[in-house]
Amino acid sequence: MSLSYLSSSSQKSFESFRQEESPACNHSYQRDYETFGDSKHTSFSSFAPFENEVSLNQAVIPSPPSHLQNFQDQFDYSSVLKTPFNPLLEANSAYFLSNQISLPDSHSYASSFDASLSPPSSPLTCVSQIHTEQNFNNNDAFSLTNSQQAFSEIGYDASNWIDELDSQQQVLSFPEFDIPEIKTETCSNKDHLENFDYLSSSIPETSGPASSVLPSSSQLESFNEFMFLPSSPPGLDEINGAPSFEELNFQISQPSPAHPVDLSSPETAPNISPVSPFAQLVKLEPTSPQKPSFALDSSFSHLDVCRHTDNQKAFAKLSSPAEYVSEFEKFSSVCDHGLDISNANINNTLTQQFALSAPYESCIVTKKPEPCITVKEEEQLAPKIESADLSITPQVTEHDSKPPVRISYDHRCKTRKQSTRICRIPPETMASLYCGPEADGKYVCLYNGCNKRIARKYNVESHIQTHLSDRPYRCDLCKAGFVRHHDLKRHLRIHENGRPYVCECLKRFNRLDALNRHKQRNICVGGVDRRQH
């Protein structure tokens, strides 16, 4: 582009500025400056150091039309506009369209170059967008105040630029074409015309400069999974024909809006969809997860159980927890090592959540509190024992009337860690019959000078019960009495299976450890020392 003339005073100032700032300029000053006739008129090309001057309309002075044809601008505008640009105003199609169809400059610039550019209101003011490293002082001849005084004396205005171009009557070298007009008489809702969300899918692509009337691709929103392209507005007149869905090669599904989660707080406004400003986001209420079902294996995996593999067939026929517990009590006599659960909540959990849907492979035994009989006087001990024998006498039942005889009792299997004996001796009397623990950690029996040393307190109390004939557990077959329940249970095996362990002296024993102790005493021919000799 060419700018205009300067006064002689401005020319002198520019000559001094050129000598000082010549290393920063890449122009050929011999070509940029040409003298035409009078020394008061000089034409020059637009370059960066005149940023402060050309930004004002009164500082723009058009040159004569005869000199426009012979002028060529040497400045490279690609670094400013980012697009190829023809300095000749006549060859710019965007300005042709703006003059022919009366479109604003913003539409022509956005379609011809880039939507992000901010188009100038006049073709001459684009030079003011060039930023250089030049710095101007207020005392310079080209400052704002001096340039206003210099150009105001001449009296030219920037509006004369277009009038002089029109008077030139130059022939345009580009082809002419018709631009379709949009008829909006039959459109019920004219807002659809300015809304880019409604775009007909059958509008063909135009070729040539006619594409300037359509929005560029950068103005349209990018498609993603949250956006669906709606159909054409209902009242729009058929400019290019209605969209033909039959010609498509795939099935088009009905568009449905997306509803992302609204994360805004109640104090703030609701979130707006980043895709379309018309789509409101819907807040989704969170749903509580379902409660996990009761699992039999995981809930009772931490409990130790007594397994009865011989009675699996009988347990498989049960249908309720009550029948299962009663059936287990009948076979409790064969349980050597039971389970004692001291927590009372496990018993409630067993009856409420235990699902009896599969054959039972294990049983859970809980502890029942046993009565403790106390006496106030020593004389009442004998009658109390007789009454207690009647109440705790076990019942002998035959199972399937087949030998050997199985005997069941009301007492369930216990571990040795818990008390399985019934003591009818007052605690004060019991405490006076032993002392300890001693230095070695053992207790000493004080009954009639027994002085037996026992390691555990539980065992020394059971030992004192034998001195006082406090044997609450009785055998119905041989009338033998025992202090502890497991001693009676071990005694009953003699009646069922006999004494399986026999010494060489023909003495029989119920347990193997009893036989080994008998042999270690060396009181018979089966002694350990006698075998070695």
From Swiss-Prot:
Record lineage: Eukaryota, Fungi, Dikarya, Ascomycota, Taphrinomycotina
This protein's UniProt keywords: Activator, DNA-binding, Metal-binding, Nucleus, Repeat, Transcription, Transcription regulation, Zinc, Zinc-finger
Name of the featured protein: Metallothionein expression activator
GO molecular function list: DNA-binding transcription activator activity, RNA polymerase II-specific; DNA-binding transcription factor activity, RNA polymerase II-specific; RNA polymerase II cis-regulatory region sequence-specific DNA binding; zinc ion binding
UniProt keyword Zinc present: yes
SUPFAM superfamilies on file: beta-beta-alpha zinc fingers
A single BP term in Gene Ontology: regulation of transcription by RNA polymerase II
ZnF C2H2-type: positions: 443-472, 473-500, 501-524
GO cellular component terms listed in the entry, alphabetical order: nucleus
Function, as annotated: Regulates the transcription of genes required for cell separation.
Species this protein is from: Schizosaccharomyces pombe (strain 972 / ATCC 24843)
Positions of disulphide bridges: none
InterPro entries, sorted: GLI_C2H2-zinc-finger (IPR050329), Znf_C2H2_sf (IPR036236), Znf_C2H2_type (IPR013087)
GN (gene name): ace2
Keyword Zinc-finger attached: yes
Domain of life (superkingdom): Eukaryota
Pfam families (UniProt xref): zf-C2H2 (PF00096), zf-C2H2_6 (PF13912)
Record's subcellular location: Nucleus
